[in-house]
């Protein structure tokens, strides 16, 4: 049991993605400040992506009603809009949910990598602004480390699971030094967007051609790449080492004759036909130096990778189940640490005062003798304090609030606030 932790969220699980925008915060920094000022939270972290808006909070007694009202005010919406979209968790459930996030289990695409980086950015922003403190910093740091370890040991995030990422990965596997190659993307639709995202993420330069230059320019403004004239491309495939073709054209854009001409003046080329129906003449594959792959082949590889990821889900859930009690003990121990630190500090201050008196009474005592006495008194204090402090930490890990409260009274420790 971990009192004082709360998570409130609107995600793709309980809201259409297109409707999530109304629950987002235009200024996350201002929202962090607003939640602390308006909902009674001592600490908070906001994880906001295209698929989720989540608030993690810590206080003595989190109040969901206050959080809901503050959220509505900060997002500029009526509280009634939450309806059944807003979901919440408390205590140990918060730990489990955050582990599911960092391990990729709660993502729309199971195992996707982006969420781990987004969680890291969220805690970094909260820490920098002072919105998070000892409890949430510890929670997020441990969840990020555990999520990374779970991903590495289970392979939940391995393999491409979009046509775009798989297509780019195949090119990387088949062509050396892709950064020095010229890449052309024909088309500006959904599949082209996936390809462009994957190319951009890996730092590759690429050109984009569409039916109109304006469409190519708009696509490149949003997704990266350099727009080129469609007509120039059709007459000059020879300028490219890699072609990604993803259009809805009802005819072959890339023909056998055009590629034959290209091969007379250059070496090999890799062509990925991601169109449906196909827009690359299959006879192109018979030409020496040409590597052609079509949408069906790539989609089958994506399906295989997705099946592999799903087969790892059980192992991930098992590891999360084992990690939750470990994290819960670590979080509970936080209640004991300031008491133990204060008790040790007070005991050492008393030791040093009495040591100074004793050394003064002894008079002309040598430096080495003084060090021996200093070491002796320090060892005595640490030995005397060690057992009760370890027992205090153990009681705290087990959630025994009575022992922690009793220790605070015995050592005259006053909690902040």
Curated annotation (Swiss-Prot):
GO biological process, one term: protoporphyrinogen IX biosynthetic process from glutamate
Domain description: Possesses an unusual extended V-shaped dimeric structure with each monomer consisting of three distinct domains arranged along a curved 'spinal' alpha-helix. The N-terminal catalytic domain specifically recognizes the glutamate moiety of the substrate. The second domain is the NADPH-binding domain, and the third C-terminal domain is responsible for dimerization.
Function: Catalyzes the NADPH-dependent reduction of glutamyl-tRNA(Glu) to glutamate 1-semialdehyde (GSA).
Pfam families the record matches: GlutR_dimer (PF00745), GlutR_N (PF05201), Shikimate_DH (PF01488)
Classification of source organism: Archaea, Nitrososphaerota, Candidatus Cenarchaeales, Candidatus Cenarchaeaceae, Candidatus Cenarchaeum
SUPFAM superfamilies on file: Glutamyl tRNA-reductase catalytic, N-terminal domain, Glutamyl tRNA-reductase dimerization domain, NAD(P)-binding Rossmann-fold domains
InterPro entries: 4pyrrol_synth_GluRdtase, 4pyrrol_synth_GluRdtase_dimer, 4pyrrol_synth_GluRdtase_N, GluRdtase_CS, GluRdtase_dimer_dom_sf, GluRdtase_N_sf, NAD(P)-bd_dom_sf, Shikm_DH/Glu-tRNA_Rdtase
Binding site for substrate: 49-52, 107, 112-114, 118
Top EC category: oxidoreductase
Pathway assigned in UniProt: Porphyrin-containing compound metabolism; protoporphyrin-IX biosynthesis; 5-aminolevulinate from L-glutamyl-tRNA(Glu): step 1/2
Positions of transmembrane segments: none
Misc. comment: During catalysis, the active site Cys acts as a nucleophile attacking the alpha-carbonyl group of tRNA-bound glutamate with the formation of a thioester intermediate between enzyme and glutamate, and the concomitant release of tRNA(Glu). The thioester intermediate is finally reduced by direct hydride transfer from NADPH, to form the product GSA.
Site (Important for activity): 97
Protein family: Belongs to the glutamyl-tRNA reductase family.
UniProt protein name: Glutamyl-tRNA reductase
GO MF terms held by the record: glutamyl-tRNA reductase activity; NADP binding
Reactions mediated catalytically: (S)-4-amino-5-oxopentanoate + tRNA(Glu) + NADP(+) = L-glutamyl-tRNA(Glu) + NADPH + H(+)
Active-site feature positions: 50 (nucleophile)
Keywords: NADP, Oxidoreductase, Porphyrin biosynthesis
Protein source organism: Cenarchaeum symbiosum (strain A)
Protein EC: 1.2.1.70
Oligomer and partners: Homodimer.
Statement: the UniProt record of this protein carries the keyword NADP: yes
Record bears the keyword Transcription: no
Residues noted as binding NADP(+) in the record, renumbered to the chain: 187-192
NCBIfam families: hemA
Family matches, as HAMAP family: Glu_tRNA_reductase
């Amino acid at each position: 049991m971990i009192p004082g932790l709360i998570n409130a969220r609107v995600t793709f699980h309980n809201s259409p993605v297109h409707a999530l925008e109304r629950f987002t915060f235009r200024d996350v920094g201002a929202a962090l400040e607003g939640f602390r000022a308006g909902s009674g939270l001592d600490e908070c972290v906001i994880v906001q992506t295209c698929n989720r808006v989540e608030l993690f909070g810590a206080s003595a007694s989190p109040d969901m009603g206050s959080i809901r009202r503050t959220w509505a005010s900060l997002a500029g919406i009526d509280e009634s809009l939450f309806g059944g979209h807003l979901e919440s968790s408390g205590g140990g459930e918060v730990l489990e949910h955050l582990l599911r996030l960092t391990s990729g289990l709660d993502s729309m695409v199971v195992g996707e990598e982006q969420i781990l980086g987004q969680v890291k950015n969220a805690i970094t922003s909260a820490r920098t602004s002072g919105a998070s403190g000892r409890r949430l910093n510890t929670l997020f740091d441990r969840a990020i480390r555990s999520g990374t370890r779970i991903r590495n040991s289970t392979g939940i995030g391995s393999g491409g699971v979009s046509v775009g990422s798989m297509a780019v990965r195949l090119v990387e596997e088949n062509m050396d030094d892709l950064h020095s190659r010229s890449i052309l993307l024909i088309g500006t639709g959904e599949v082209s967007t996936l390809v462009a995202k994957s190319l951009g993420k890996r730092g590759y330069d690429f050109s984009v051609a569409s039916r109109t230059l304006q469409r190519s320019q708009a696509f490149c403004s949003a997704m990266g790449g350099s727009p080129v004239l469609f007509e120039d491309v059709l007459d000059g495939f020879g300028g490219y080492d890699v072609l990604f073709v993803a259009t809805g054209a009802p005819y072959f854009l890339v023909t056998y004759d055009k590629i034959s001409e290209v091969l007379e003046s250059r070496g090999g080329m890799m062509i990925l036909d991601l169109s449906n129906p196909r827009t690359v003449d299959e006879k192109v594959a018979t030409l020496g130096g040409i590597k052609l792959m079509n949408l069906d082949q790539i989609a089958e590889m994506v399906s295989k990778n997705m099946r592999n990821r799903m087969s790892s889900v059980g192992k991930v859930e098992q590891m999360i189940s084992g990690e939750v009690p470990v994290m819960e003990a670590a979080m509970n121990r936080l209640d004991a640490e300031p008491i133990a630190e204060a008790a040790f500090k007070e005991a050492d201050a008393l030791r040093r005062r009495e040591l100074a008196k004793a050394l003064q009474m002894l008079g002309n005592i040598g430096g080495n003798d003084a060090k021996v006495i200093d070491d002796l008194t320090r060892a005595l204090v640490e030995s005397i304090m060690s057992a009760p402090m370890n027992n205090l930490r153990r009681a705290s890990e087990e959630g025994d609030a009575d022992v922690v409260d009793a220790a605070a009274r015995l050592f005259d420790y006053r909690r902040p606030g």
